[in-house]
């Protein structure tokens, strides 16, 4: 039997974490690792102690800000980073596995926190219908290693 490599294990976990999201629009999961050890996990949704979108706004999702983004939700990357920092875990030099490429604001946080590598499953640009993955472009421009996960993986009972 062949053992799975850590990239496969961590991306599979990110995919499963995405299923925990209460967001009506998109489910995203993230795993933050350092030297093959998990240091934090996250998925998109409102901060703990606030309302879940699928419960509070089941027909249309949470309220939107002036740019059309959810006004309540934290992104999966933000949740993973915030939880690590809240628990005094250093994230500098870590690797982030995420099911959706980071948006530009998340990319700025990733870079600022010293995360050295990002592996993502789906393109944010394709999801949003925009020209490029601005977050990925930003990270690459400033020296963060970024790669798209290329192996087949099961997401919502389908191989992608």
Q: Model regions: which residues?
A:
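Zinc-dependent deaminase catalytic domain
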Residues: 1-160
